[in-house]
Amino acid sequence: MTAILERRESESLWGRFCNWITSTENRLYIGWFGVLMIPTLLTATSVFIIAFIAAPPVDIDGIREPVSGSLLYGNNIISGAIIPTSAAIGLHFYPIWEAASVDEWLYNGGPYELIVLHFLLGVACYMGREWELSFRLGMRPWIAVAYSAPVAAATAVFLIYPIGQGSFSDGMPLGISGTFNFMIVFQAEHNILMHPFHMLGVAGVFGGSLFSAMHGSLVTSSLIRETTENESANEGYRFGQEEETYNIVAAHGYFGRLIFQYASFNNSRSLHFFLAAWPVVGIWFTALGISTMAFNLNGFNFNQSVVDSQGRVINTWADIINRANLGMEVMHERNAHNFPLDLAAVESPSING
């Protein structure tokens, strides 16, 4: 009997690192996208927490009137925010080493730019990591495609909109009330409620919520009972079981009789594709709408579009919205300008002396 012994070459450190990074046996999959995702998201999260607690006021409008956003400077969880980078910086890349001092960097809102850029890179890598793990497991790529909707929305409000408006100071503040302020000002300046892409986004979000609730309630109402009346119906399911856990025929029949026959899906796969696609496509359109309004391609303007035979204006709902827009525009950045541009009929008089 002859034994053949084969010497196994020791794998290099780099090879072992590559195998570990791409292994699907790890408790949490890392992947090559994860190599970039982990440090960028850790950086964004750490700076956000520190700045939300202790960042000094920021000169957001570039007029030497700083705005406080952190907890230690008088805010609470609702009013607090990471104040956007100053209008004095505009779209300039503003890392710490570009400022004369850390105090100057903080005064000009440097943390906002740092957080936003690291966050966008991190969530983009998270999307790539979803695709990478799906690829390694032999799955289809639709999880990453669905996640592209919130990535597109975040990119639109944090990057595309500031680029279109010419300054990171126009980006969305990182806080609860700051988000509401961004929405109000956006409506005042771009009439987003009258933009068709925003309407599609609203249909996507609310429609997705409705369809999700309908699907969940139908499934829960048509479970195949495997337990007694004294036990929870949930105890009748075992992870990985081959048999169906609910009766799709019963659910289909119920919904078909509740609405009409063809309103109900008879194919579970097409149903779940629809549940995923509806909100994703809606949010894609919203992100596209934000990106177009960033360059001032705004919502529809039907102001004073209805007149009587004498030429007098008959107010419509569009005129009410326009009046609200003007009021909101007057109120925001009230120290940065004396009069909103929409209300200025003539050029400002020259001042001599």
Swiss-Prot record:
It is an enzyme of class 1 (oxidoreductase). Chlorophyll a PD1 binds at H198. Keywords: Acetylation, Calcium, Chlorophyll, Chloroplast, Chromophore, Electron transport, Herbicide resistance, Iron, Magnesium, Manganese, Membrane, Metal-binding, Oxidoreductase, Phosphoprotein, Photosynthesis, Photosystem II, Plastid, Thylakoid, Transmembrane, Transmembrane helix, Transport. Fe cation binds at H215, H272. GO terms for biological process: photosynthetic electron transport in photosystem II; response to herbicide. It is found in: Plastid, Chloroplast thylakoid membrane. A quinone binds at H215, S264, F265. It holds the Pfam family Photo_RC. The modification Phosphothreonine is found at T2. The record marks Y161 as: Tyrosine radical intermediate. Tyr-161 forms a radical intermediate that is referred to as redox-active TyrZ, YZ or Y-Z. [CaMn4O5] cluster binds at D170, E189, H332, E333, D342, A344. It is a multi-pass membrane protein. Its main location: plastid. Pheophytin a binds at Y126. The record marks A344, A345 as: Cleavage. The chain crosses the membrane at residues 29-46, 118-133, 142-156, 197-218, 274-288. Belongs to the reaction center PufL/M/PsbA/D family. Photosystem II (PSII) is a light-driven water:plastoquinone oxidoreductase that uses light energy to abstract electrons from H(2)O, generating O(2) and a proton gradient subsequently used for ATP formation. It consists of a core antenna complex that captures photons, and an electron transfer chain that converts photonic excitation into a charge separation. The D1/D2 (PsbA/PsbD) reaction center heterodimer binds P680, the primary electron donor of PSII as well as several subsequent electron acceptors. 2 of the reaction center chlorophylls (ChlD1 and ChlD2) are entirely coordinated by water. Herbicides such as atrazine, BNT, diuron or ioxynil bind in the Q(B) binding site and block subsequent electron transfer. PSII is composed of 1 copy each of membrane proteins PsbA, PsbB, PsbC, PsbD, PsbE, PsbF, PsbH, PsbI, PsbJ, PsbK, PsbL, PsbM, PsbT, PsbX, PsbY, PsbZ, Psb30/Ycf12, at least 3 peripheral proteins of the oxygen-evolving complex and a large number of cofactors. It forms dimeric complexes. This is Photosystem II protein D1. It comes from Sinapis alba (White mustard). The gene is psbA.
